[in-house]
């Protein structure tokens, strides 16, 4: 946000990887000459050439007189260097502005810079007794319309969306962001034995929406057919007879995918948790009871033996959505990372 004479004259944000950073977008959107203005940024301006030129360069050229910064950039290529360059050019800086609030906004970026897998969040809808489907597998719909609309906003915020083959076979989803001006996330399907149908919505739209299928299958004929339809095949090592989910995430990180929203079933969720790959959870909770020991839960598998082994969450936030509630929280160990 750029301010001059106590008026906001420009705003901007980093819209996508490879696109203009927030500072350059804000300068581009200025309604008048920003010379002598002040700028407020959540993250220290970059000072190196990457996919875009340094933002420090743009601020100097624009004649900005002061920069207010929420967080210093943990990227070793920046890490205080942006502040130094601005100061060396006579631009005043002040850091630590709303530092904690800015850290929360920058969670995904900070994690991406400091870790070898993307920031990974589980999303599921469940009843008050913790069921994501009935004993017969029926799950449409657990939550109401407002909660389901909110999911599409959430998808828009993540670079990729992951699901297991069980979800694809049961629901034939599109896994896109159906909101105005929404960005469709890259779709990642964990399909160990390539059971996905060539007639599924995922495969039929693979040329419109980037689609990755992670597998351990060596079925070259099926692989060739899926590739012809536009799917990218990601081969991984085997873990317990399935794709190695941590390896999948590492490969996604190498593709510069910074965040993954997981909309899988209990088996995929359990695998991710077991491999320490979960950083946040979004639980949409409906005021309903299903019951039944065979009804599916958000996390399958053997479960833990001792309470001390439980995954614990902090920074909890509850949001009413019609008759439902969205409860979100961050895994405690992930808070220590940032």
What role is predicted for each listed range?
Residues 1-6, 124-125, 327:
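Short beta-strand scaffold segments in enzyme catalytic cores
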Residues 2-101, 186, 212, 273:
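Zn2+-dependent cytidine deaminase-like catalytic core
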Residues 46, 86, 130, 164, ...:
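Residue-level signal for inorganic ion chemistry
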Residues 66-67, 160, 259, 280:
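Residues at the N-termini of beta-strands
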Residues 74-77, 100, 169, 195-197, ...:
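Short gly/pro/ser/thr-enriched loop/turn and capping motifs at secondary-structure boundaries
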Residues 111-112, 121-128, 132-258, 267-270:
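Active-site ligand-binding patch in enzyme domains
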Residues 218, 301-338:
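Conserved histidine-centered catalytic loops in small-molecule metabolism enzymes
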Residues 273-313:
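Flexible, gly/pro- and Lys/Arg-enriched active-site loops
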């Amino acid at each position: 946000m750029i301010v001059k004479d106590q008026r906001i004259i420009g705003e901007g944000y980093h819209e996508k990887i490879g696109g203009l950073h927030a500072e350059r977008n804000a300068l581009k959107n200025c309604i008048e000459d920003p010379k002598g203005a002040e700028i407020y940024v959540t993250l220290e301006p970059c000072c190196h050439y990457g996919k875009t030129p340094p933002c420090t360069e743009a601020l100097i050229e624009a004649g900005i007189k002061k920069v207010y910064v929420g967080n210093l950039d943990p990227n070793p290529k920046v890490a205080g260097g942006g502040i130094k360059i601005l100061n060396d050019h006579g631009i005043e800086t002040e850091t630590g502005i709303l530092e904690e609030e800015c850290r929360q906004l920058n969670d995904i970026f900070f994690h991406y810079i400091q870790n070898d897998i993307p920031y990974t969040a589980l999303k599921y809808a469940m009843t008050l007794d913790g069921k994501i489907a009935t004993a017969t597998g029926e799950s449409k719909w657990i939550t109401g319309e407002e909660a389901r609309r909110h999911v599409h906003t959430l998808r828009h915020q993540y670079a990729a969306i992951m699901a297991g083959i069980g979800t694809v076979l049961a629901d034939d989803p599109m896994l896109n962001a159906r909101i105005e001006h929404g960005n469709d996330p890259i779709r990642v399907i964990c399909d160990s034995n390539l059971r996905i149908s060539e007639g599924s919505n995922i495969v039929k739209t693979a040329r419109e929406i980037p689609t990755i299928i992670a597998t351990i299958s060596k079925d070259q004929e099926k692989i060739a057919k899926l590739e012809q339809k536009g799917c990218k095949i990601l081969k991984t090592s085997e873990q317990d007879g399935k794709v190695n989910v941590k390896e999948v995430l590492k490969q996604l990180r190498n593709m510069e995918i910074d965040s993954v929203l997981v909309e899988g079933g209990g088996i995929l969720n359990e695998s991710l948790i077991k491999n320490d790959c979960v950083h946040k959870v979004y639980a949409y909770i409906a005021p309903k009871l299903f019951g039944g020991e065979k009804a599916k839960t958000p996390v399958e598998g053997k479960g833990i033996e001792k309470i001390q082994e439980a995954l614990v969450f902090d920074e909890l936030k509850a949001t009413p959505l019609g008759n439902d509630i969205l409860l979100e929280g961050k895994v405690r160990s992930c808070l220590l990372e940032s």
